[in-house]
Amino acid sequence: MEEQREILEQLKKTLQMLTVEPSKNNQIANEEKEKKENENSWCILEHNYEDIAQEFIDFIYKNPTTYHVVSFFAELLDKHNFKYLSEKSNWQDSIGEDGGKFYTIRNGTNLSAFILGKNWRAEKGVGVIGSHVDALTVKLKPVSFKDTAEGYGRIAVAPYGGTLNELWLDRDLGIGGRLLYKKKGTNEIKSALVDSTPLPVCRIPSLAPHFGKPAEGPFDKEDQTIPVIGFPTPDEEGNEPPTDDEKKSPLFGKHCIHLLRYVAKLAGVEVSELIQMDLDLFDVQKGTIGGIGKHFLFAPRLDDRLCSFAAMIALICYAKDVNTEESDLFSTVTLYDNEEIGSLTRQGAKGGLLESVVERSSSAFTKKPVDLHTVWANSIILSADVNHLYNPNFPEVYLKNHFPVPNVGITLSLDPNGHMATDVVGTALVEELARRNGDKVQYFQIKNNSRSGGTIGPSLASQTGARTIDLGIAQLSMHSIRAATGSKDVGLGVKFFNGFFKHWRSVYDEFGEL
């Protein structure tokens, strides 16, 4: 479809803008080359799954932290005429009676984008896709300084979720995240995003097996998984003693001067101007299409940049189709932080950004309070999170007829004990949505002797009262530093989510009072 072609072209341009700015002549040449390539290769979504997979790989590589991901989506939304609304502002004058396309951001890591039709009313509810954008990572400690160990420079870090295990050893790790700084002569604190890619600045070395039992693990996460960042010599460039000006930074003494100088240079500020920082370590190796028949996509941080990416691209594709002056629908993608550590933060699913957006935007739109109970009773929330592909090396852990395989379609997550929010009506609704959109649906449920993971689904269901359905794109090697999915699965996710926005209201109406 034409609108999906335009989205892919814009996505490519946005990804390029987030790297090195080319010269004008090179930029024109590249744009002409892209246009020609797109004219030859891009027709409709179903025939270009590999193109979408490659765009996803580039997106993952160029946006290694949650801050970068949300910033990227914000820029993409800007380019597609979504209007930014500050949470700190009054929305009454920003959302008119004609509705429109909007987004807001909390903490730089929690984003909600929405489309509000002119003819919407409370009885029409809201069509929601909720996902999480955080991924397992390693965090720099507030005081990361460590004395050198026989000349080795090291930094103190802490696991975010289930990391700093054997899977993180011997990986090329970059560093990136958000810096807060205050320029000299001003009182305004600003932020900057930094990213060392493609340079791996550190590594957590394993112990050779020749040393016997100490090399076997498990390893102490405090003392045996410390990243090594260098082996500096006294006379090398950049190893000069800290200057009096550098000592003025609140971070001086908390982090090694080499690291402070490095990240300050990335941000284009001076060490003395640094106020605070939130930095992650991450695998810098770029993802790739793999398998002898190109059936797979291998990349880091799939959980859950996978569903987040597919959902946001689907919303933007849908926005190209919808005329807000004629529409009676309210559609949103809301992306959360901190799912991997329980969601109980202001930027997590339990922080209530979705509920806030619906309440504030609906009352600004109607110019009067809206009965939110009516809104949520008529709404559908898709809790989109990755689930588990069948691993052929461990067939005994899977429930027969309840596991997905690659490159087939979206997977419903089911659990009779409430770890997933999907109910029988939700299952039937998804199957009908898939039928209308030409998609296939797979099931995933654990065996009785296994434990279930969790999603944001039960939280959103209990906080809103809306019917909530847990589903997602399936992957192998969940919570590994590198994982895999089907090479068609990103595109299949975009296709299904786009169909959800188009059809959810008419399908849900068929269920009446159920």
From Swiss-Prot:
Glycans are attached at residues 107, 110, 448. It holds the Pfam family Peptidase_M18. Transmembrane segments: none annotated. Belongs to the peptidase M18 family. Signal peptide: none annotated. It catalyses: Release of an N-terminal amino acid, preferably a neutral or hydrophobic one, from a polypeptide. Aminoacyl-arylamides are poor substrates. Zn(2+) 2 binds at residues 303, 339-340, 479. One of its GO terms (cellular component) is cytoplasm. Strongly and specifically activated by Cl(-) and Br(-), which act as positive allosteric effectors. Inactivated by metal-chelating agents. This is Vacuolar aminopeptidase 1. The keyword Phosphoprotein applies. Keywords: Aminopeptidase, Glycoprotein, Hydrolase, Metal-binding, Metalloprotease, Phosphoprotein, Protease, Protein transport, Transport, Vacuole, Zinc, Zymogen. Present with 5730 molecules/cell in log phase SD medium. It is found in: Vacuole. Zn(2+) 1 binds at residues 132, 303, 339-340, 385. GO terms for molecular function: identical protein binding; metalloaminopeptidase activity; zinc ion binding. Its EC number is 3.4.11.22. Its cofactor is Zn(2+). Substrate binds at residues 210, 339, 385, 388. Residues 1-45 form a propeptide. Its main location: other. The keyword Manganese does not apply. It comes from Saccharomyces cerevisiae (strain ATCC 204508 / S288c). Homododecamer. The precursor form of aminopeptidase 1 (prApe1) assembles into dodecamers and further aggregates into higher multimers (the Ape1 complex) in the cytoplasm. The Ape1 complex is disaggregated in the vacuolar lumen, but mature aminopeptidase 1 (mApe1) retains its dodecameric form. Dodecamer assembly in the cytoplasm is essential for formation of an enzymatically active complex. If cytoplasmic homododecamerization of prApe1 is disturbed in mutants, homododecamers of mApe1 will form in the vacuole, but they are enzymatically inactive. Interacts with ATG19. Binds 2 Zn(2+) ions per subunit. The average amount of Zn(2+) bound at physiological metal concentrations will be lower than stoichiometric. InterPro entries: Peptidase_M18, Peptidase_M18_dom2. The modification Phosphoserine is found at residue 356.
